[in-house]
């Protein structure tokens, strides 16, 4: 049986044993540091990815204080740095605030019931009772004696009583009204003298007619004479 041939040492594979070749060369300092095997492992502070993007662009480490936070200008740090504890409970830093003005008590300078036992009627004098306010703008109603005597006669006959409101149009005459013109508003258009005499004549005739209906022709004639002191002239043709 032939003995196995031995290969020269130069022909041996390099990966069989690297310890014989000596220690491996060290990595260059400029080469990036490899990431840790696990993404949960803490990243070393000198790793280039640990720095912020702006710091990497500037190629310098970030300015940090002892707590590890970024430094701020003194003006910004003075205003934005939170104070320890509750800021609302701390005393003011710059001077003392002016003393608050004492709120004026309502009883000071006023007449109270304890100091003045008499009731204060200062505010009640201007108020007027309700029945007076309802009738203060109306004129008092005066009923003439002649109207009272007529009402007593009408009560005996069972007729409705007369009111003291003066009415130019008798109750038994029909007066058509337009829906836009009220009876209490006077007409604004001018009236000629002929129409005025005609209206007076018709009014006197209506008063005479109502006086005869009520059974007192003399009173009807008197009221007609009062309404028309002069005899009507002949109507002019329009």
UniProtKB/Swiss-Prot annotation:
Protein name: UPF0328 protein ECU07_0010
Organism lineage string: Eukaryota, Fungi, Fungi incertae sedis, Microsporidia, Unikaryonidae
Composition-biased stretches (Polar residues): 129-152
Species of origin: Encephalitozoon cuniculi (strain GB-M1) (Microsporidian parasite)
Residue stretches of biased makeup (Basic and acidic residues): 106-128
Region (Disordered): 1-154, 211-238
UniProt record similarity statement: Belongs to the UPF0328 family.
């Amino acid at each position: 049986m032939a003995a196995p041939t031995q290969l020269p040492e130069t022909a041996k594979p390099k990966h069989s044993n690297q310890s014989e070749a000596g220690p491996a060369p060290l990595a260059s300092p400029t080469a990036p540091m490899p990431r840790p095997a696990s993404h949960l492992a803490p990243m070393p502070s000198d790793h280039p990815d640990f720095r912020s993007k702006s710091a990497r662009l500037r190629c310098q480490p970030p300015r940090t204080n002892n707590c590890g936070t970024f430094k701020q200008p003194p003006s910004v740090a003075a205003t934005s740095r939170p104070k320890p504890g509750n800021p609302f409970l701390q005393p003011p830093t710059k001077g003392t605030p002016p003393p608050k003005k004492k709120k004026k008590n309502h009883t000071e300078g006023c007449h109270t019931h304890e100091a003045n036992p008499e009731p204060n009627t200062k505010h009640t004098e201007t108020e007027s009772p309700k029945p007076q306010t309802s009738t203060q703008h109306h004129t008092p109603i005066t009923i003439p004696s002649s109207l009272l005597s007529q009402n007593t006669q009408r009560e005996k006959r069972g007729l409705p009583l007369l009111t003291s409101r003066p009415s130019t149009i008798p109750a038994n005459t029909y007066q058509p009204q337009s829906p836009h013109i009220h009876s209490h508003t006077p007409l604004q258009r001018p009236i000629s003298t002929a129409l005025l005499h005609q209206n007076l004549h018709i009014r006197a005739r209506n008063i005479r007619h109502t006086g005869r209906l009520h059974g007192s022709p003399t009173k009807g004639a008197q009221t007609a004479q009062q309404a028309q002191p002069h005899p009507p002239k002949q109507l002019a043709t329009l």
